[in-house]
Structures are given as C-alpha cells and as structure tokens.
Amino acid sequence: MWFRSFAFVCFLMPAALPAQLEGVIDLHVHSAPDSGPRSITAVEAARIAVRYKMRALLLKNHYTHTASLAYTVSEVVPGIELYGAIALNRSVGGINPTAVEHMARTTGGLGRVVWMPTFDSEHSHRTANPNPLFVSVAKDGKLLPEVLQVLDVMASHGLSLATGHSSPAESLLLIEAAKARGIDRIVVTHPQPDPVAMDIETQKKAAAMGALLEYKFNSTLAPNSAWPSEFVSMSDTLKSIRAVGPENVVVSSDLGQPGNPIHADGLFAFIQALKSAGFTESEINTMMRINPAKFLGLK
C-alpha cells in the first residue's frame, strides 16, 4: 500500500523528515495513556516531534481531558509545545460546562480546545455506531441550552471549538452560535468520513462562515474491520482540500492506533501527497503551520 511505502521511506531518509516537518503542528494526536489501545505514549510522541523539529501537538482523548497530560509531558520533554483538550462524551458528563471550566483552569493553562461529542454523539448513534446512551447537542434545529452554556464558558476562557462527530446541520449551528459569542477559532472535525459525512457544498458553507476544516491522514488508510466507513481515498481528500481552499484547511494525522503509522510518518506522507497533487509550499505551510497555530491561539 502507498501509505506503508511512505512510512518505510521515512526510515530510509531520516534527514528528510526534520526538513519537511519543522514547525508543523498536529491537531489530532492519540497516545497512551488511554482506555483503549495506542501504539505510542504521549512522551514518545513528544520526543519524536522534538526530533523532527515540530512546533506543537494537540493531545486528544475521547473520554478524559488532556490538559493535565499536556502539562506533565511538557515537564518531561522540553522543546515542543503540548496542548490539551476535552471531548464532551458521557465519561465527562456529556455537555458539561463544569468539566470545560475545570479543563480550562488546569495547571499550566494548556487546555485549549473543546470537542463536541465524538463517539457518543447522537449523529454517530443514528448514522454509524449505534449507542443508545448518546449525547445530543441540538433538538428541533436548535442547540440545547447546555450547549450554549458550554460556549459561554469557552468564550470566557478563550477556548477553541472543534465540532466533533456532530451532523453537518449541527456543525453549522455550532459555528453560528460560537461566532455570535466571539469564538473565532473553530474547526469542523474531519468532515469527509462517517460519521460526519459533510458534503462538499456544506464544507464550503462552513468555511464561508469562518470555520477551518480538518482533513486527516488516518481516513486515507485502507479500510479496516472496525471502522470501514471512515475510509476516504487520498485522491478524494486532496480534491476536497482544493475545493474548500487551503486557506480554510488544517491537516492533521489522527494517528496513534496499533498497526497504523506514527504521527510524524503520517504527516510526512500527507506532505508528499500534497506536493504530488500540485499544492505549493506556501499552501502546505498554511494548512500545517499557520492555520493550526491560529486555531490554538498561538502567534
């Protein structure tokens, strides 16, 4: 498979990775400790990022906030900026303003992002992964009051919004409500694959409303038995990026699963695919350095 050969190239040409990945920010990093299997620890991911001169990693966990982990690993591994987030799944109380408040107040101030529900989202339950204990964000075309409360807490702490596994319609509602509260740093979480499955016209609309759209390497890997509907070919991914416009895009890995490439290898392979498709160095810089930095509130 092409992605395996790219990972192999990364081992054959170690000098190429620092040059390609210097200053890159990955906004979707899975790692251990976690309640599910991971191929790499957060400490290992940070050390590899330092080796390749990356700027920052955003640590993601579907079931607990990662601001504490980001702070602890930062104490152990200098030379890399690490940030944490919270995903509003059932394990943190679902749409829970108090959980967001505590994440924002965690030592170090490294909690930067709130994901709306992911694996526990109502949209995921109805379209991809049945889960009767789902977490709703909207009813009858309107965001729930507790979602608006979360957005208010986010605005007061200067946090960034990721739409999680919300439906396309819910994502647009979230963007509109967030912008109304002065939350300008918004990412539509991997809009292409299930369970989000946002069509290209809606992706363009989200961009026009002021959101960035995330395209991830993980989805381009060969479909597996656990998540076959998440597969989106690299060709289709590149077409969507071009249609939406690199100025409206962030590129991430969403890696850390056993059997998949590690984060740096996936990003390196994504860069090679972008270059092969005619994307310029300036466009790649925008998608992998400038826009991710803006989303995290970095200068």
Report residues per predicted region:
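Active-site environment of divalent metal-dependent phosphoester hydrolases
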Residues: 32-34, 64-68, 89-92, 121-124, ...
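Mid-to-C-terminal alpha-helical segments outside catalytic/metal-binding sites
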Residues: 264-299
